[in-house]
Amino acid sequence: WYKFANSLKLRMAMRTCYVAGFNVNGKTSQQLAEEAVAAGVMTAATDGAYRKVADHNPWQRFMVLWSDARISADLTCYMNAYNDPRREAYYDKSTFGTVSGNAYTGEESYVGLRRGILQGQYNSWSQGSSCMKVTTSDNIVVFRASEVAFLRAEGALRNWNMGGTAKDFYEEGIRLSFEENGITSGVENYLASTGKVEAYKDPLKGQSAQTYDYSGAINTNVTVAWSGGDFEKSLEQIITQKWIANFP
């Protein structure tokens, strides 16, 4: 609980860093963040905080049992571009592979549901998209050590005393996320990845009645491999990987 409280303090301090004049009892966001780290935050995958499910995991209920939601196309576009091994832990492969003319094969058979899908196409289109892997008894994620590492990476990028460099904490966050999701290989290749995110591809392209343009264009050129140098680009890398690691 002590590590959890300090980790939460670090998260709150980081979220206030852009608030002009912010302070608590005269302490700035930087001072509060440095206090939290010095007092001890979550550093190991086993430090993570989870809520035990008393009856039925809600993600399983509406994702699997009710089949009312699917993985976001935004997430799969990033993870496919980075050839992310965590896909197999996060969600299953789509069923579009059985559709004639489907462009998705092999590792690219992870297909998310884009925003703005027509309600009338629910059964014929959205049901084929990748679904979250979750069971009725899975615990609910509250706070993971990987997020703490990314928070420390952001702090270090701002030249706050986080106990290490932005690059080291960034890469540690990715390693912790792999461990938290049971992925035992591929992390070094992932850390060296220079793949860039591409626009969403319609898995049913060529079938005019079910082909959609995606207005949610992805505008980024960040890679997984740490670039260093430019503050905004490094910050985008940290936030992108934190977003992926914080699934769901």
Regions found by a protein language model. Name each.
Residues 1-186, 228-236, 241:
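Structured, solvent-exposed acidic/aromatic patches
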Residues 178-248:
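C-terminal functional modules
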